[in-house]
Design a protein with these regions (language model features):
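Divalent metal-cofactor coordination and adjacent catalytic microenvironments
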Residues: 1-156
Length: 156
């Protein structure tokens, strides 16, 4: 089963309370907390439906097997789809080996393609052997745009 969870949420929203109030033509402050909650909810819905993370945050992609998140093209380029975009960086790739030891995959063993949507990882040789533990593979990533000005208007 594939799961993406947020471990560190964004520190800001794609639009400000003032921008939302201007759009709604609200001139009083009584409902500011409610408007802020609506902004957060709207961002979360956009992120869930689009797979795009709007502002910098840390997420963990969990999977049971490499094949769940991977695919192979005809040239045997074993790729893993990171399922979210934009990805600023892959912080770590952890897995439990055959002896049930938590290992970190060396960055020297894979490439990342962070410009594709969805972003991808490609193993240089072959994926390491893993055990059958649920949630065995954990890919930790920093995702989202680093500046609200870079977020496409259609997603705001």
């Amino acid at each position: 089963m594939i799961q993406i969870s947020t471990t560190t949420g964004p520190t800001t929203e794609p639009i400000t309370t003032a921008q939302a109030k201007e759009h709604l033509r609200v001139t009083f402050s009584d409902d500011d907390a409610y408007i802020d909650a609506l902004i957060t909810t709207a961002r979360q819905v956009v992120e869930a439906r689009s797979g795009m993370r709007l502002f910098t945050q840390t997420v963990v992609l969990r999977a049971d097997y490499w094949s769940e998140i991977g695919f192979s093209d005809p040239h045997r380029l074993d790729l893993v789809s990171l399922r979210v975009a934009p990805v600023q960086s892959v912080t770590s790739v952890n897995y439990y080996d055959d002896d049930d030891i938590d290992r970190t995959l060396s960055t020297a063993l894979y490439w990342t393609d962070l410009d594709s949507v969805p972003c991808r990882m490609q193993i240089k040789d072959e994926w390491p052997s893993i055990n059958e533990r649920a949630g065995n593979i954990r890919v930790t990533m920093v995702v989202g745009w680093d500046n609200t000005d870079n977020i496409p208007a259609i997603l705001k």
